[in-house]
Design a protein with these regions (language model features):
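Flexible, surface-exposed loop regions and adjacent strand-edge segments
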Residues: 7-12, 47-57, 133-143, 149-152, ...
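Transmembrane beta-strands of outer-membrane beta-barrel proteins
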Residues: 30-34, 115-121, 195-199, 233-235, ...
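Outer-membrane beta-barrel transmembrane domain signature of Gram-negative proteins
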Residues: 62-73, 133-237, 242-246
Length: 290
């Protein structure tokens, strides 16, 4: 019944977060992160935008919140902001989310110095539900003054109901799974030759309750060489794919290359070190796409 509901805006939320780093061995590190929340919200079935848009249209003295006899007034077809906020019923929603991440890093220096292997796995999930129960508010307008007993003469503008109507529910959720593995190499030889390389594979699967699920994955690589901290050459590539395209056209190869010159490291720039601390010239060319 209408006496059993509460339109007051209330919010309760519980958060949890835990980050754990473990060093299993001198060359092996593991990280596990988990976070999430539980949330419950109670409010009026009318949106905040609707309530405030009506309130901004009326001056405070245009009509009372209630007539002296208890009836609720309304102005033309606009309704009554107070009644919209307190007399229409209630909406209750709940939401929950969990985010997890697991990563592993293995130093492969026993094979060759500067070589590392990394892996990451994450799983996220979100869900929400909402139940709305509402009724029609009974509105009255002042007709013509007062009767012989001094009571206001009112005319019914809109017939209301005493009970909340059938509930309307809405549910939504999504989940995401992400995986990544990379092999990294970073080493400097005889203090002049800096070599770095990276090879990375990733995959993401996303399932949304309001759309078709999709998945994409790719392979990326990078190799760079720096001589004496001044001359740089770099090559990158991406081989990316998605199931959004037809078979045979789901993958694309996107390479790029660049060369650079760190002018500020040259001997003739040293007198200007305090004025120009970093000056670099770079030229690159690459291909991008979807």
């Amino acid at each position: 019944r209408s006496l059993d509901w509460d339109p007051t805006i209330k919010l309760q939320r519980y958060n949890v977060r835990s980050n754990v780093d473990l060093k299993l061995s001198p060359t092996t590190q593991v990280r596990f992160n988990i976070g999430g929340y539980l949330q419950d919200r109670n409010s009026s079935p009318e949106s905040t935008d609707q309530i405030f848009s009506r309130a901004f249209r009326f001056t405070p003295f245009m009509f009372p919140v209630r007539y002296s006899s208890g009836e609720i007034p309304a102005w033309q077809e606009e309704g009554n902001p107070w009644a919209m906020a307190t007399q229409r019923g209630f909406a209750r929603s709940s939401a929950s989310k969990i985010e997890t991440l697991f990563s592993l890093e293995q130093d492969l220096k026993f094979l060759t110095p500067g070589l590392k292997l990394r892996g990451t796995f994450s799983f996220d999930r979100y869900s929400t539900g909402k139940v709305t129960r509402s009724k029609t508010v009974e509105y009255w307008n002042a007709a013509s003054g007062r009767n012989e007993e001094g009571e206001l003469i009112l005319a019914q503008k809109q017939q209301g109901s005493n009970f909340l109507g059938t509930s309307k529910s809405a549910e939504y959720g999504n989940k995401s799974i992400y995986m990544e593995a990379s092999l990294n190499y970073d080493r400097t030889f005889v203090d002049k030759h800096a070599v770095s390389a990276m090879l990375l594979f990733n995959r993401r699967h996303y399932d949304d309750g309001s759309a078709l699920p999709y998945r994409n994955q790719g392979l990326a690589g990078r190799a760079s060489y720096t001589y004496n901290g001044k001359y740089v050459a770099e090559f990158n590539f991406g081989y990316n794919g998605t199931e959004n395209f037809a078979k045979g056209k789901r993958y694309g190869f996107f390479p790029s290359a660049a060369v650079g010159w760190i002018v500020s490291e040259e001997p003739f720039m040293q007198p200007l070190r305090n004025t120009i601390s970093k000056l670099k010239l770079r030229a690159s060319y690459g291909q991008v796409g979807n």
